[in-house]
Regions:
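Short amphipathic alpha-helix that is part of the acyltransferase structural core
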Residues: 1-33, 38, 49-53
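A short beta-turn/loop motif at secondary-structure boundaries
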Residues: 35-40, 131-133
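Conserved beta-strand in the GNAT
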Residues: 47, 53-62, 66-74
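Conserved acetyl-CoA-binding loop-helix of GNAT-fold acetyltransferases
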Residues: 75, 81-94
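Acidic/histidine-enriched, beta-strand-rich ligand/metal-binding domains
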Residues: 78-80, 102, 109, 113-117
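Conserved catalytic-core motifs of GNAT/GCN5-like acyltransferases
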Residues: 107, 119, 124-140
Length: 146
């Protein structure tokens, strides 16, 4: 089940999963992983629950802007390769569309190894630039949802 994380308990579970994936597995510094956008009123945190366990998270930021961003997409290691990420991204798109009630332009900063995954969901590169974020190669991608 995909839902918006609202309670402090749910948000803390989401932050813990992100810390596990990004900080522990990918060695991203904690001060880069958790940031001020996590507590912005224009951020929506999304969770994927399986048997009441949070196994996937993402966040929608800049919900007050013309272009919103999906980021901090993390899936528990034990559940990767099972289509959870695909369902989570589609869920994020649906939630964004439901909240904003208009055409939605979504941009994201994809880790280079996830580019094919996002391409399969209809995202395209914005440019040819590959850049480092937290010492991991990324590319900018975009999708318009009518």
């Amino acid at each position: 089940m995909i839902k918006i994380l609202k309670s402090k308990e749910e948000l803390n579970l989401g932050f813990a999963l992100r810390t596990k994936v990004f900080v522990e597995e990918q060695n991203v510094p904690i001060e880069l992983e958790l940031d001020e956008k996590d507590h912005s009123e224009n951020t929506v945190h999304i969770g994927y629950f399986y048997d009441d366990k949070l196994i996937g998270v993402a966040r929608l930021i800049d919900m007050d802007k013309d272009i919103i961003h999906i980021g901090r997409v993390a899936i528990d290691k034990d559940y990767r390769g099972k289509g959870i990420g695909r369902e989570l991204i589609i869920g994020c798109e649906t939630i964004a569309k439901d909240i904003l009630k208009r055409e939605v332009i979504i941009e994201l900063s994809a880790q280079i190894q996830a580019e094919k995954f996002y391409k399969s969901l209809g995202y395209n590169r914005v440019n040819d630039r590959i850049y480092l974020d937290a010492r991991i190669e990324h590319v900018d991608m975009k999708k318009v949802i009518d």
